[in-house]
Structure formats: structure tokens, C-alpha cells
Amino acid sequence: DAQEKRQPWLPFV
């Protein structure tokens, strides 16, 4: 997914 890469943080890291 590109959504997690556009975010500066990871809510599901």
C-alpha cells in the first residue's frame, strides 16, 4: 500500500 508510505508516521508499525 502507498498510503502507509505517504504518511510520515506508522500507525500500524
Curated annotation (Swiss-Prot):
<feature type="modified residue" description="Valine amide">
    <location>
        <position position="13"/>
    </location>
</feature>
<keyword id="KW-0027">Amidation</keyword>
<keyword id="KW-0964">Secreted</keyword>
<dbReference type="GO" id="GO:0006952">
    <property type="term" value="P:defense response"/>
</dbReference>
<keyword id="KW-0878">Amphibian defense peptide</keyword>
<protein>
    <recommendedName>
        <fullName>Peroniin-1.3a</fullName>
    </recommendedName>
</protein>
<dbReference type="GO" id="GO:0005576">
    <property type="term" value="C:extracellular region"/>
</dbReference>
<comment type="similarity">
    <text>Belongs to the frog skin active peptide (FSAP) family. Peroniin subfamily.</text>
</comment>
